[in-house]
Amino acid sequence: MSKIIEGLKYSETHEWVKIEGGIAIIGVTDFAQKEMGDITYVDMPAEEDEVNAGEEFGALESVKASSDLICPVSGEVCEVNAELEDSPELINSDPYANWIIKVKISDESELDALMDAAAYAAQIGE
């Protein structure tokens, strides 16, 4: 079974979101990293880039596949996880500790479209 954290929000495209004071911390779920296999590269936006809910903001590459990252919220990228540039495999070791980007949310109502832990577990059949 995949690890799913209570208190986070989840997208249908397997990104998780943690909200801290108007900032969305975004990463990929345990389910996603297991499906991808060993992650070898993370493509991330630059700080201060604008991102939009439902649109691509980067990609993960693994030995098995490449997968677009879809942003669950709109806003301005305020931080990227630079550790992932040299060590993308950190996502495999702990996808919830190793976030990808932080976004200053421009429309908090977009969070309503995301799933809670129970709904996400049902979506992935766990």
Predicted regions located by residue number:
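Structured functional modules or segments
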Residues: 44-96, 105
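Acidic, low-complexity mobile loops and tails
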Residues: 1-56, 93-126
